[in-house]
């Protein structure tokens, strides 16, 4: 019987939200299972985990220095401390399985679990795995990925686990009208949702201030989350005489409601964003981050290739590009419907259930191989 599961994932929404989705799915299938989310005291999980009704345990954040600095010499001791603290949590909650989602806390959790003979499950949300999950995948046969191209040997393709609010999102005409009214928008106008992640995206903001008037002239209204640091700048640059509603917010406190209000989205292409939009059947213009290893472009490709979105490089995005490529979709109910159907078909709505099944399979291997909580 599965009694206690530790889910390690913290720092960013891309690590925290999948962990929470799996925790919710485990709770729904068996309320007796003890669920502990392992994170840091300063990441998003410090706010999100308690808000979702789950227990949070923390370990020190041990980032890998990107260039040689004196901090490199402190890394081994700090990492060992994180492993010890993760191990204390595993002992305290008598963990049957450790599930890691990458990020700062997963590597210490994997090593602490390995030392104790606790089965490990790894979930990788991105096309290219990070260091922590490359390590974790070497320690277990229970590896789940979100993309078929992810280079982790022996992995099972599950997709990204999503919260129930996204999977059951109602985007019927009546629900869309109600969602728009809650944001002070016209219930009947085509609606573009713009957001750039939790901190916003300056290039998206700049394009929207330039495109606001021609979009409004075409009958399009906008719900735009600028990011808290960018709000005043965007508000000052936005035209005042727009003929259609333009609802400007520093952030969106309930993203499912924003998805329900929108016909199309202009956004970055983080793994969670792409998975949520696919599940919601919401077409998007994806603008990958212009730096990093190109993973945001890879995140968006399955949906774009299926016909559920448009893809444009950050350097190529402009008001004229938006008007030439996105506006014709926004004003065509037929094109929106086709893209929505294609978008929804590119997702993995059973991801959380598949990972729960993998967790139970992992727990069963320990029961067969050794007494529960026997010393390694």
Swiss-Prot record:
> What would be an example GO MF term here?
undecaprenyldiphospho-muramoylpentapeptide beta-N-acetylglucosaminyltransferase activity
Give its localization: Cell membrane
An annotated GO cellular component of this protein is: plasma membrane
Q: Which residues form a coiled coil?
A: none
List, in alphabetical order, the GO biological process terms annotated in this UniProt record. carbohydrate metabolic process; cell division; cell wall organization; lipid glycosylation; peptidoglycan biosynthetic process; regulation of cell shape
Note the topology in the membrane. Answer: Peripheral membrane protein
Pathway noted in the entry: Cell wall biogenesis; peptidoglycan biosynthesis
Reactions the enzyme catalyzes: di-trans,octa-cis-undecaprenyl diphospho-N-acetyl-alpha-D-muramoyl-L-alanyl-D-glutamyl-meso-2,6-diaminopimeloyl-D-alanyl-D-alanine + UDP-N-acetyl-alpha-D-glucosamine = di-trans,octa-cis-undecaprenyl diphospho-[N-acetyl-alpha-D-glucosaminyl-(1->4)]-N-acetyl-alpha-D-muramoyl-L-alanyl-D-glutamyl-meso-2,6-diaminopimeloyl-D-alanyl-D-alanine + UDP + H(+)
Keyword annotations for this protein, in alphabetical order, are: Cell cycle, Cell division, Cell membrane, Cell shape, Cell wall biogenesis/degradation, Glycosyltransferase, Membrane, Peptidoglycan synthesis, Transferase
Q: Does the record carry Cytoplasm as a key word?
A: no
What is this enzyme's EC? 2.4.1.227
Question: Where does this protein hold UDP-N-acetyl-alpha-D-glucosamine?
Answer: 12-14, 126, 163, 198, 296
Its biological purpose is as follows: Cell wall formation. Catalyzes the transfer of a GlcNAc subunit on undecaprenyl-pyrophosphoryl-MurNAc-pentapeptide (lipid intermediate I) to form undecaprenyl-pyrophosphoryl-MurNAc-(pentapeptide)GlcNAc (lipid intermediate II).
Family note: Belongs to the glycosyltransferase 28 family. MurG subfamily.
What is the protein's name according to its record? UDP-N-acetylglucosamine--N-acetylmuramyl-(pentapeptide) pyrophosphoryl-undecaprenol N-acetylglucosamine transferase
User: What species does this protein belong to?
Assistant: Frankia casuarinae (strain DSM 45818 / CECT 9043 / HFP020203 / CcI3)
The UniProt gene name for this protein comes to murG
